[in-house]
């Protein structure tokens, strides 16, 4: 897998744990060795079960545990970044959902530090469905909780969220500039230069 990834000239690999963190630490160590030899850095996508804005507290607490599991794995793989979806708004307002997510984010940062994973970088991701918590502004709000948090900007998701009215062939240059300007304004300094990014081939 490392050789195949390197054959494309890639230097980063995002290990998917959407259905749960199931990779054993022994296998992770073997992957780390193989990918290190090719100069490829790992990140981990945390489980899709995360719901930082849930109305149910146990689901919010479980979300923190999923992030801890993901941090343990990414460290075993020799990486630092953990990407995750914050969750949906459900039957509450966006404002209420964001407040719950911010509270869960604070708990997550504390738990990550207490578990010894303070060097891990949590990366909330922009989302494509309108009812999901994940506009660029919402993601940047989550990043305000701690200076170690950086955004995962999924440009395909932002395009889908706008139903193709943004980041299309006509508007892309101005839209990309606006996104980068917003990140720079919210995260001054080096953090804005190191945001995580996803690109997907989506067309409306």
Please give the residue ranges for each predicted region:
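A general structural motif
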Residues: 10, 37-41, 79, 117-119, ...
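A structural signal for the main folded, soluble domain(s) of proteins
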Residues: 3-5, 38, 99, 111-121, ...
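Histidine-acidic metal/acid-base catalytic patches
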Residues: 140, 145-155, 159-204
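N-terminal pre-domain/capping segments
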Residues: 1-46, 50-71
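Active-site acidic/histidine proton-transfer and metal-coordination neighborhood
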Residues: 53-153, 160
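Active-site beta-loop-alpha junctions enriched in small/polar residues
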Residues: 16-20, 47-51, 87-89, 125-129, ...
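Hydrophobic faces of well-ordered beta-strands that scaffold small-molecule active sites
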Residues: 13-15, 42-46, 82-84, 122-124, ...
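Short amphipathic alpha-helices and their capping/turn segments at secondary-structure boundaries
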Residues: 2-3, 24-38, 68-75, 135-147, ...
């Amino acid at each position: 897998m490392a050789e195949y990834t390197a054959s494309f000239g890639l230097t980063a690999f995002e290990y998917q744990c959407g259905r749960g963190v199931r990779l054993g630490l022994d296998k992770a160590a073997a992957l780390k060795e193989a990918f290190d030899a090719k100069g490829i850095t790992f990140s981990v996508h945390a489980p899709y079960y995360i719901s930082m804005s849930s109305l149910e507290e146990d689901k919010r607490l479980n979300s923190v545990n999923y992030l801890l599991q993901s941090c343990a794995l990414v460290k075993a793989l020799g990486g630092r970044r953990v990407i995750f979806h914050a969750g949906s708004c459900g039957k509450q307002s966006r404002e209420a959902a964001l407040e719950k997510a911010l509270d869960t984010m604070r708990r997550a940062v504390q738990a990550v530090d207490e578990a010894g994973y303070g060097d891990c970088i949590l990366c909330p991701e922009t989302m494509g469905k309108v009812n999901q918590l994940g506009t660029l502004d919402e993601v940047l709000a989550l990043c305000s909780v701690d200076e170690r948090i950086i955004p995962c900007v999924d440009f395909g998701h932002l395009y889908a969220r706008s139903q193709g009215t943004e980041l299309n062939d006509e508007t892309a240059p101005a839209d990309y500039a606006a996104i980068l300007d917003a990140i720079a304004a919210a995260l001054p300094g080096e953090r804005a230069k190191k945001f995580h990014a996803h690109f997907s081939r989506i067309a409306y």
